[in-house]
Amino acid sequence: MKLTKILLFISSLNMIYALDLSGLNSNQEWKTLQNNDVSIKTTQYLEFPICRAETILSLPLKTISAIIENVENYPNVFLRVTKSRVLEDDVVHIMLDMPFPFSGRDYIIKYIKHKFSSAWTFRFSAVEHEQAPPEKGHVRLIHAAGEWKLTAINDLETNVSYTWNGELLGDFPNWALDRAWKTQGNEMMEWLNDALQD
């Protein structure tokens, strides 16, 4: 009973202090890493490196959002995801493969979905969960946070924006971060597009 109360207290604190990207605004100063079919940029926000990849897909918003909100299917869509386990209705544990020689990464997130007239968002922040203790060979991304934002351009085209905390922790060298962020942004958009073509 006492342990349960302690875990609830820790979880509550974690939710209060979790990184929330909703404060990012259009006045934010961004550094462009790539500007072609997929634009990728980065900024500092609350002392964290925040990245954003953006593109236009020739598909309806509803079709794209169905793929993004199906978190259990992530290993079949986003190929670096090796495991995606739903812990609660809005909490998921995600494990990622990293290129050799780096350790894998994992994170537990709580997500919220919002639907507006012509826009849809899927925002997430890191939490702790007793059913997902740290695993050997993986670095826990304790500040994981991000947002998918879909904005309908018309019935057949959608602007897709993916924003995430680019902090990789562990043994990942700072000099390789820009390259890692570009790779991640391109992979996420490529794999999402591929899944939508199936």
Cite the ranges covered by each PLM segment.
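Sec-dependent signal peptide recognition
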Residues: 2-9
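Hydrophobic h-region of N-terminal signal peptides that target proteins for export
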Residues: 10-18
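Hydrophobic ligand-binding cavity/cleft-lining segments
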Residues: 18-89, 159
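Hydrophobic-ligand binding "helix-grip"
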Residues: 19, 106-155
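Short beta-strand segments that buttress and anchor functional surface loops
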Residues: 41-42, 92-99, 124-126
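Beta-strand elements of well-folded, non-transmembrane domains
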Residues: 57-61, 98-100, 115, 128-130, ...
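Mid-length scaffold segments of soluble, non-membrane domains
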Residues: 70-115
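A short acidic/glycine-rich loop-to-helix N-cap element
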Residues: 132-140, 166-187
